[in-house]
Amino acid sequence: MAAARNLRTALIFGGFISMVGAAFYPIYFRPLLRLEEYQKEQAVNRAGIVQEDVQPPGLKVWSDPFGRK
């Protein structure tokens, strides 16, 4: 009885962790794995945007999120 309860708990917990991992893959891990593709997409999306026109006064100017230090 106790083994079945532990197995059920482990399966539920494992399923939850799998669902969280599946949700985070396209949000976080895919852009890290396909860096050039996302850099090109952002260049297209940001074409024609002047940072000074959209940046609120007093805030740091946004930069390339893929730029590494």
From Swiss-Prot:
| Ranges of the Mitochondrial matrix topological domain | 1-8
Cross-referenced InterPro entries: SMIM20 (IPR027917)
Q: Which is one Pfam family of this protein? A: DUF4538
Q: Does the keyword section mention Flavoprotein?
A: no
**UniProt KW keywords:** Amidation, Membrane, Mitochondrion, Mitochondrion inner membrane, Secreted, Transit peptide, Transmembrane, Transmembrane helix
Which superkingdom is the protein from? Answer: Eukaryota
Q: Which residues carry this modification: Phenylalanine amide?
A: F66
Instruction: Give tissue specificity per the record.
Output: Highly expressed in the hypothalamus, substantia nigra reticulata, Edinger-Westphal nucleus, and nucleus of the solitary tract/dorsal motor nucleus of the vagus, the spinal cord, and sensory ganglia (at protein level). Also expressed in the heart, thymus, esophagus, stomach, spleen, lung, pituitary gland, kidney, jejunum, duodenum, ileum, cerebrum, pons, and colon (at protein level). Expressed in preadipocytes and apidocytes (at protein level). Expressed in pancreatic islet cells (at protein level).
What's a GO biological-process term for it?
mitochondrial cytochrome c oxidase assembly
Q: For side Mitochondrial intermembrane, which residue ranges?
A: 30-69
Q: Which residues cross the membrane?
A: 9-29
Q: Name one GO cellular component term.
A: extracellular region
The subunit field of the Swiss-Prot or TrEMBL record says: Component of the MITRAC (mitochondrial translation regulation assembly intermediate of cytochrome c oxidase complex) complex, the core components of this complex being Coa3/Mitrac12 and Cox14. Interacts with Coa3/Mitrac12 and Cox4i1. Directly interacts with newly synthesized Mt-Co1/Cox1.
Q: What is this protein called?
A: Small integral membrane protein 20
Species assigned in the record: Rattus norvegicus
